[in-house]
């Protein structure tokens, strides 16, 4: 009985010590967390975990990339690669200090950022090398039309200049724009819906307890890494979230489970946002072009004249300098070689993003047209 009492007392003492330690670490993090990360910045740059630190919040257009990053251990689908940003926080070649005047700005999400390849292998980097033009890669993971508009408006207000903006409209833009983001009258991007509430909590953690947020990410990353399977299946396996975001272009229902609002209303909302972007660019004597491209799910399940293609080709009539439609290229490949061979040639396995060959397809067309 005495032994049990002592054991119980020890247990409660350990719990109290744990919570006191945790509380003190949060207090320390609240006041000194940012400074701790700054002091250890050079160490984290040598690890794959720095990918968390280089993606930062923005008070106007929601999120972006940290300036002057040189991350040599960024994890890609075919090994590690070097991820760099310039002095503006745009993905670029390493150690670039450039001014605010650009001939062409490319806007989009992770496809445009080239999140899974080094800059030189992304379609923006390939185009820049071939054309020798002053190019800005404005794209970042998880961007969508509300952020496209907000960020470009912000950059123009900060003295950036462009002659031409090319917007790559992603398949996921309809879902992301309606489900994740809100836009106020000042063109500032906020968060929307239940998912938005989770993002708000995450942002509070990042802003107030940055070091705690970071080491939680490291622990999660290490756990995920230990669970990775190296054996490939004969057919690709996509994340449920990707399947959900892709389905709207090749299904009939006006309302899809898991979506925020009807497909038709979300299409109209996206068009209104891009129309505002068009008028903003026109007021500043900047030409606009749009580009559309398929995800693997579109190649497998959709038609070449997809809803996605139709809505944006119609929008571009009388507005866009160019309308880049990459659906025919990939559907022609499907016709010749089949879906699976087309997928393996142009996309990363078990993922929706273009591999190096897929990026070359996009870049080659840009080089032909944007001279």
Question: Which stretches of residues belong to each language-model region?
Answer:
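Serine-dependent acyl-ester chemistry module
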Residues: 171-313, 326-337, 345
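Histidine-centered active-site loop/cap adjacent to the catalytic His
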Residues: 32-33, 345-371
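Loop/turn elements at helix/coil->beta-strand transitions in domains of secreted/extracellular proteins
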Residues: 132-134, 160-165, 282-289, 319-322
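Short, amphipathic alpha-helical "lid/cap" segments that border enzyme active or binding sites
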Residues: 145, 149, 267, 271, ...
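Membrane/wall-proximal cationic-aromatic binding patches
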Residues: 35-130, 242-253, 330-334, 338-349
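Conserved SGNH/GDSL esterase-like catalytic core that processes O-acyl groups on lipids
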Residues: 113-195
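Hydrophobic membrane-insertion alpha-helices, especially the h-region
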Residues: 12-29
């Amino acid at each position: 009985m005495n032994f049990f009492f002592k054991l119980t007392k020890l247990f409660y003492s350990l719990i109290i010590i744990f919570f006191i330690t945790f509380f003190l670490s949060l207090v320390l993090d609240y006041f000194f967390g940012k400074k701790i990360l700054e002091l250890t910045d050079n160490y984290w740059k040598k690890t794959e975990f720095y990918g968390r630190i280089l993606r930062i919040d923005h008070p106007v257009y929601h999120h972006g990339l940290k300036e002057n990053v040189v991350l040599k251990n960024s994890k890609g689908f075919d090994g590690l690669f070097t991820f760099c940003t310039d002095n503006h926080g745009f993905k670029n070649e390493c150690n670039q200090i450039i001014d605010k005047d650009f001939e062409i700005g490319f806007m989009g999400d992770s496809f445009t950022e080239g999140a899974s390849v080094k800059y030189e292998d992304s379609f923006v980097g390939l185009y820049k090398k071939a054309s020798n033009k002053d190019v800005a890669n404005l794209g970042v993971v998880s961007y969508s039309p509300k952020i496209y508009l907000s960020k470009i408006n912000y950059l123009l207000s900060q003295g950036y200049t462009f002659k031409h903006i090319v917007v790559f409209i992603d398949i996921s833009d309809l879902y992301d724009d309606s489900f994740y983001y809100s836009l106020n009258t000042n063109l500032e991007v906020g968060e929307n819906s239940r998912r938005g509430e989770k993002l708000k909590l995450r942002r509070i953690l990042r802003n107030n307890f940055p070091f705690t947020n970071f080491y939680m990410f490291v622990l999660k990353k290490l756990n995920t890494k230990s669970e990775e399977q190296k054996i490939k299946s004969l057919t690709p396996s996509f994340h449920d979230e990707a399947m959900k975001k892709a389905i709207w272009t090749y299904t009939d229902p006006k309302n899809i489970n898991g979506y925020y609002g009807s497909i038709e209303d979300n299409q109209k909302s996206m068009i209104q946002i891009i129309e505002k972007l068009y008028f903003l660019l026109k007021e500043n004597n900047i030409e606009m072009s749009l580009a559309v491209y398929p995800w693997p799910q579109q190649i497998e399940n959709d038609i070449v004249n997809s809803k996605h293609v139709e809505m944006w080709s119609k929008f571009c009539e009388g507005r866009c300098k160019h309308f880049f439609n990459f659906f025919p290229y990939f559907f022609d490949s499907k016709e010749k070689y089949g879906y699976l061979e087309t997928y393996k040639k142009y996309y990363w396995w078990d993922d929706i993003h273009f591999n190096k060959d897929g990026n070359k397809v996009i870049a080659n067309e840009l080089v032909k047209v944007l001279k």
